[in-house]
A protein has these predicted regions:
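Hydrophobic/aromatic residues within transmembrane alpha-helices
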Residues: 10, 19, 23, 71, ...
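Specific transmembrane alpha-helical segments of multi-pass solute transporters/efflux pumps
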Residues: 1-6, 32-84, 120, 207-225
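Membrane-interface helix termini and inter-helical loops of multi-pass transporters
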Residues: 5-13, 43, 73, 122-135, ...
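Transmembrane alpha-helices of multi-pass small-molecule transport proteins
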Residues: 12-63, 88-93, 148-152, 169-188, ...
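Small-residue-rich packing faces within the transmembrane alpha-helices of Major Facilitator Superfamily
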Residues: 1, 25-29, 115, 150, ...
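Glycine-/small-residue-enriched transmembrane alpha-helix faces in small-molecule transporters
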Residues: 1-21, 58, 129-158, 177
Length: 275
């Protein structure tokens, strides 16, 4: 929850690509120190599996956070939490698309409910906006980021068997390298990253807690429980995130949030049923 809250609080101060870039640049040396004892043993696996590592790095490290932070320029943190809550449904759907995983009638019903809830939030409960394709661009950016995270989660099953710290260190490094040209373009055409007390504090929080701690825990959860069950963390995030957005950012919960969230959570519940 702290990732989107911090990014929303800083989006009037620091451009989105710069925030993502410096978040990872601060995290990299810390990760390398943590992973150093394991990297020499995993180096061969890194060389042999560079293609899948680039794919995972792009969709999680580069694309997901950039799209999320870009979207938060135009929409609320509450919307971002509720749209992100639909990740388990995209994980199930993409598992079918890429790996031919089966889906039963109950899971199909769950996907329908979650989709209705997500669309309800994006169109703010107004059917006219849906018919006119009048969407908040910020919500669409975040939806794109949500799909990127689902792709990352699904393809984690193809990642090489290596120490979690080594895996995170190499994917963060690759992701930051991919992000570098976009950061340079942002400096030239949008604005440079200002280095102030609040930006430094925000970047440190994102680098340590939202990057290192959160990613290590999530990747480990996927390794142990599988992508579908690990994605169930989305039950908790929209509720805790909404509370934090109200308390820390002064955001308001609207009727379309109240309608959309139960639909998404019900969709996650039915979508996780194997039978």
């Amino acid at each position: 929850s702290g990732n989107a809250i911090t990014a929303k609080g800083l989006n009037d101060i620091i451009p989105p690509v710069g925030l993502v870039f410096w978040r990872w640049m601060v995290a990299i040396p810390i990760l390398v120190i943590i992973a150093w004892p394991h990297l020499k043993y995993d180096l061969k696996k890194i060389r042999e599996n560079w293609k899948i590592l680039i794919i995972l790095s792009f969709f999680s490290i580069t694309a997901y956070n950039t799209l999320l932070y870009q979207g938060l320029l135009y929409t609320t943190a509450i919307n971002s939490f509720l749209i992100n809550a639909s990740r388990p449904m995209f994980i199930v759907l993409l598992s079918i698309v890429f790996f031919r995983n089966g889906i039963n009638l109950t899971q199909s019903f769950g996907f329908l409910l979650a989709s209705l809830g997500t669309v309800n939030i994006i169109v703010e409960g107004q059917v006219g906006k849906l018919l006119a394709l009048d969407f908040n661009i910020g919500d669409l950016w975040i939806l794109g980021g949500t799909i990127c995270w689902a792709i990352h989660t699904v393809f984690l099953r193809k990642s090489p068997s290596m120490h979690p710290a080594s895996f995170l260190a190499i994917t963060v490094t690759i992701g930051a390298i991919i992000l570098l040209p976009f950061y340079i373009l942002e400096i030239i055409y949008v604005a440079p990253t200002p280095f102030k007390l609040e930006t430094v504090g925000g970047v440190l929080y994102l680098a340590i807690f939202a990057s290192i701690v959160a990613y290590l825990c999530y990747n480990r959860a996927v390794e142990i429980a599988g992508p579908n069950k690990a994605g169930q963390v989305s039950y908790i995030l929209p509720i805790s995130g909404t509370v934090l957005a109200i308390l820390l950012l002064g955001e308001r919960i609207e009727l379309f949030h109240i309608i959309g969230l139960p639909l998404i959570l019900a969709g996650i519940y039915f979508g996780s049923k194997d039978k």
